[in-house]
Structures are given as C-alpha cells and as structure tokens.
Amino acid sequence: MRKEPRSIELLSPAKDLICGREAINHGADAVYIGAPKFGARAAAGNTLDDIRQLCDYAHLYSARIYVALNTILKEEELAEAEQMIWQLYEAGADALIVQDMGITQLNLPPIPLHASTQTDNRTLEKVRFLQEAGFTQVVLARELSLNQIREIAERTTVPLEVFVHGALCVSYSGQCYLSAALSGRSANRGECAQYCRLPYSLIDADGKEIVSGKHLLSLKDMNRGEYLEELLDAGVSSLKIEGRLKDVSYVKNVTAWYRKKLDAILA
C-alpha cells in the first residue's frame, strides 16, 4: 500500500561544478559530488571553492548538495577529515555521504550523514543499526529485490535511497578486494582498478578451457526506468543515478529522462 504523501528525490551525480549545475538545470532535486579527498572516486575530487559555488547555485533552485566522503580512513587522516567536514559544512553542503563509522565519533558540525552504499546495506538489521546511529538517509545495496526493499521500508523510518541507473559491480559494494589483491589499489580507498571489466577465460577442474576471452565478471549497467512506480510503492524516498565519472552530456540527458518519467508518475 502506497504511503501518502510522497516526497521523492531524484539524485544525480556530478564529477565537477559544470556537471552539477547541468544536473540541477535538467531536473535533479539533489546532486552528489566528491569531496576534495576521501571519496570513493579518487579521480572525481573537487575543490572547496567549486563545492561552495555549486551549493550556492543549488540553493537558488531549492536543490540539495550531498558531498561524498565515502572511503575507509586511516587513523592519521581523521583530523584532516574532521577539518574538511567543517569546511564543507561552511561551504553549504546539505549532507555528507560516508562509509567509515569512525566519522560519527569526530567533532562534527550539525550536518546530516547519509550511509553510503559502501557500508553494504543489505539487511534490515544493518539499516536499523544505521538509523539508531543517527544516519538520516541510507543507500541500499543495488542487489536487493523489491520485496527486500519493501520489508526494510516497512520496518524502519529512515529515508531509503536506491540506485536506478548506472554501473553494477560483480561484488557487494564495500566488500570487493579484487583490485587491492591484484594491484594494491583499494576500492575502499577510491582507487578501484576495475579488474572485473577485463576479459577472462573460464577453465574447469581438469584444465579444459570452457570460455575464452569473455567479460565474465562485467555486469551490464542497471536501468530501472520501467520500475519506478514499484520502487516508490515499496517505500523508497530517493532515486539515485550512478555516474560521478560521467561527462556532462550523460548527466544531463539521463537526469532529464528520469525527471520526465518521475513527473509522469507523480502527476
């Protein structure tokens, strides 16, 4: 049974200031963007000045800016992270997307915390824990079914965010160690080498090659555009588009497409 009234957020990615502005121009209710450091996309960091400009622009149109600071931190980085969080708060950020629970123990400004998909939010128990820990939004694991999402929504009160479009990983977010094992580049430090996107051959126990040179671990991209109504009925509050490394053409076109579909549902 649908719960009325519905307040649904369309959340778009931005690798930089230009992408963020265009996402807002094409219908995003909120935009998520990388912090200067400690984001899960190391190549998508942004300066504090650019984040401040984007916040100012977003707030003109009643849009929100969420800053991703969603990697595992080393102990010697906590003081720098704390200082950066205060700077992001002063720049106008509306929330932080985080992975490391140690952040909750820092001296923080009054800024909402969202639990990143990197915290591996697959179970009702995990979401309840995050809700009780004070998180104001939880990004659910991409792998959950509609029934699983509905159960979590019915038995918690924290707003739930789900991915509706973009890349899929072969592993649970925050739980993949392939890149770190093969190259020393940790996905939990924003440096995933994406070995799952390479071609592999499949060999059985007898050494016989079953498949040769195929992309066996590379999943097709997600597109839940035809299931938005079902997701909303399941209790989702935020629809998230993946793509903090995508260019501006991708961001504005995918945002506009989902804006049109969502408006038709909510009309």
Q: Language-model features: where?
A:
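Short, glycine/polar-rich helix-capping loops at beta-to-alpha or helix-loop-helix junctions
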Residues: 122-126
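Active-site pocket-lining/capping segments in soluble small-molecule metabolic enzymes
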Residues: 2-121, 140, 148-238, 245-267
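Extended, well-folded interaction surfaces typified by the phenylalanyl-tRNA synthetase beta subunit core
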Residues: 132-137, 144
